[in-house]
């Protein structure tokens, strides 16, 4: 008996949950930005892009088709890249003094098309070294690291489960 080409029902629900969680994390960041007046830095914006990219990959994978395995791997790679950006952000906040009121990433991030289409969402307004009050004891980059790590674990688990199914 051959293994199914597309995603199983359980995998589709997992992929949908990951996509929704990614959107919710970006929505939470926007709420913090607008309600608490905490401007996002370039690394925050990069993390938003990566969460949205994960959502895109997982939603397309959940829709099915022949490229589910590729989309799973792309989602996992994006989550790992997001975790790396979050770790860098945590490091910058732990070692302030890298910038002199200007972040070298700002012009690059602000020149991307989404920054022109949706400035409140993708426009840089703060510095990466700025510390905001923690939420439940963790800074925002730490929460992003938790989110990216949880997504990576869930995707890794699904990839492993799918590999076991195919070898059986």
Swiss-Prot record:
Any one annotated GO CC term: plasma membrane
Gene that encodes it: dsbB2
Signal peptide: none
Function comment: Required for disulfide bond formation in some periplasmic proteins. Acts by oxidizing the DsbA protein.
Residues in the Cytoplasmic compartment per record: 1-14, 65-69, 162-168
Entry membrane topology: Multi-pass membrane protein
Coiled coil: none
Transmembrane segments: 15-31, 50-64, 70-87, 143-161
Protein name: Disulfide bond formation protein B 2
Disulfide partners: 41-44, 100-128
Organism name: Burkholderia lata (strain ATCC 17760 / DSM 23089 / LMG 22485 / NCIMB 9086 / R18194 / 383)
